[in-house]
Amino acid sequence: MRKVIPILGILLLSFIILGCLGSESREARLIIFHAGSLSIPLSQVEEKFTKYAQEKLGVKVTFQDEASGSVKAVRKVTDLKKRADIVAVADYTLIPQLMIPNYTDFYVLFATNEIVIAFTNKSKYADEMLKNPDKWYEILSRPDVSFGFSDPNQDPCGYRSVMVMKLAELYYGRPIFKELVEKTTNIYSNGTRIYAPKEIIIKDKRVIMRPKETDLVGLVESGSLDYIFIYKSVAKQHHLSYITLPDDINLGDFNKADFYGRVSITLGSTGKTIKAKPIVYGITVLKNAPNRELAIEFLRFLLGNEGRKIFEDNYQEFLSPPVAFGNVPPEIRRLVEVKD
């Protein structure tokens, strides 16, 4: 009997050790580089997926999120050679332009947005802005008013904000781009072609620039900054006041694509030229993703009903259906429209 007890103890200890090893083998981490404007909806999708993965897949998932401007998110992979599972950007064209074919072989267009001008009741002339939104460019031109946008070289919201001001110049027939951009920064234009130097210099203390658009939210909330160009979804998520811009300039109307396309910007950071177009977000799973199968399962979850509802609850309209290009994984094909 005395011999049996130690043997039983050894067997019990073995089961405990094997059980621990087994549970560790079912843990996984997903690394996501994403646009700052996706932070809130993505975190909510991740929370739901964590429960789903534990219950349905038997996997304990943790997420390593890195929010940045979308250009910077892509360059973490292409220039810095950092490993990630998923890249999600605010301008889908960055994926085919900079990541295919070396880093991924497919991408999905899944959500839309528009540019607005956001502020609070602390902002100078806030009441006037609300009552007379068509005077926005006059208010931003006043010497006691500060405004901001994100860095065009790092963030699509930045280069879109600059293009919105050039489109406004065409739409209103007023020198809006010259007054708000060329006089305050070293960004310049030749006709409808805009050039953003690799190092952008701010020449007027009224103008504030940050790496990504969400970096500007706190400045407006605190009253340190009067107005910002930002995505409508972000303004609503943070309960900011905002004015909408005409469809001809807000980059949110697919019917205005031809008018938008009259304007382009060349980025000093990449050397690439980007035409103004309706805002569409893109997402992909990388070829060398550390947890590629699980990343595709997460993408399937995001594109499904639960993911769609989370995005729409956060004021970000989902494409119906999402549109996919390239070597689309079979796991998501029924959720998307595949195009050549």
Curated annotation (Swiss-Prot):
Residues annotated for tungstate binding in this entry: G36, S37, S70, D155, P156, C157, E213, Y231
Cellular-component GO terms for this entry: plasma membrane
CDD domains, alphabetized: PBP2_ModA_WtpA
Source organism, top-level taxon: Archaea
Binding positions (molybdate): G36, S37, S70, D155, P156, C157, E213, Y231
GO molecular function: metal ion binding; molybdate ion binding; tungstate binding
Presence of the UniProt keyword Secreted in the record: no
Record function comment: Part of the ABC transporter complex WtpABC involved in molybdate/tungstate import. Binds tungstate and molybdate.
Name this polypeptide is given: Molybdate/tungstate-binding protein WtpA
Protein species of origin: Pyrococcus horikoshii (strain ATCC 700860 / DSM 12428 / JCM 9974 / NBRC 100139 / OT-3)
Gene name of the encoded protein: wtpA
